[in-house]
């Protein structure tokens, strides 16, 4: 299966089982939780999984990194079409993604097909709240368009947020996220906003009991999960391999 994200959880026996989510069937994903709850682990796990299985001919990235830290290591991958960390560049990168989506739909119309057959494009946002606080007027319409029409064009939005409020995750945008990964939250109200029920506030404290526990809301289904953390050296090795001139020349 292609375009998968890692999802792990502990079984009653204590072992770790790692199935996968088919991202092509769940086009958009929101990851939210308090600081230190495991958002970065989940996000890097998704990217790692794609790098280990997909070439730039199959998967492309638009990386939105307002904190300038989490996604910087992926900037020079051959998969990366756009990397943006400054607000003007972020707006331009999102506009490029919208234009690319429109281009794909025009091509589909010309070919009389209902679904795009080219590379999947992942628009990955490390901190959605930063965009909604600082440049909401410019970015919200672009994100809504991507989330509303991206699926048939193989355009996926994956967004992280540690600020769990309606002002920073607008409801019209949130409604387009078919899958939500709710990590530990500060209170029950935030949990209900994320996954439509309480529970995230009672997840293990990441400072004392471990990171990466969460609830996965996938349509009507709700599942308690644990996110697997890939060793950093494995991710670094994958990045190095893809960025090597020998690898690119052999593609």
Residues covered by each model-derived region:
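P-loop NTPase catalytic phosphate-binding loop
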Residues: 1-114, 118-207, 211, 215-216, ...
């Amino acid at each position: 299966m292609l375009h998968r994200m890692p999802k792990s959880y502990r079984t009653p026996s204590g072992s770790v089982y790692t199935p996968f989510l088919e991202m092509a069937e769940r086009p958009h994903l929101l990851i939210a939780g308090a600081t230190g709850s495991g958002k970065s682990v989940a996000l890097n796990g998704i990217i790692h999984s794609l790098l280990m299985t997909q070439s730039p001919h199959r998967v492309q990235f638009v990386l939105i990194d307002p904190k300038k830290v989490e996604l910087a290591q992926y900037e020079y991958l051959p998969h990366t079409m756009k990397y943006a960390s400054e607000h003007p560049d972020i707006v331009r990168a999102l506009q490029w993604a919208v234009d690319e989506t429109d281009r794909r739909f025009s091509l589909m119309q010309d070919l009389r097909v209902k679904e795009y057959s080219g590379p999947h494009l992942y628009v990955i946002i490390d901190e959605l709240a930063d965009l909604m606080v600082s440049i909401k007027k410019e970015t919200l319409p672009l994100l809504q368009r991507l989330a509303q029409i991206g699926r048939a064009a193989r355009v996926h939005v994956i967004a992280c947020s540690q600020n769990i409020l309606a002002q920073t995750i607008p409801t019209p945008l949130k409604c387009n996220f078919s899958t939500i990964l709710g990590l530990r939250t500060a209170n029950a109200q935030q949990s209900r906003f994320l996954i439509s029920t309480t529970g995230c506030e009672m997840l293990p404290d990441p400072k004392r009991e471990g990171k990466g526990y969460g609830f996965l809301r996938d349509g009507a289904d709700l599942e308690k999960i644990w996110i697997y953390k890939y060793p950093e050296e494995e991710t670094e090795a994958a990045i190095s391999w893809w960025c090597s001139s020998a690898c690119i020349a052999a593609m």
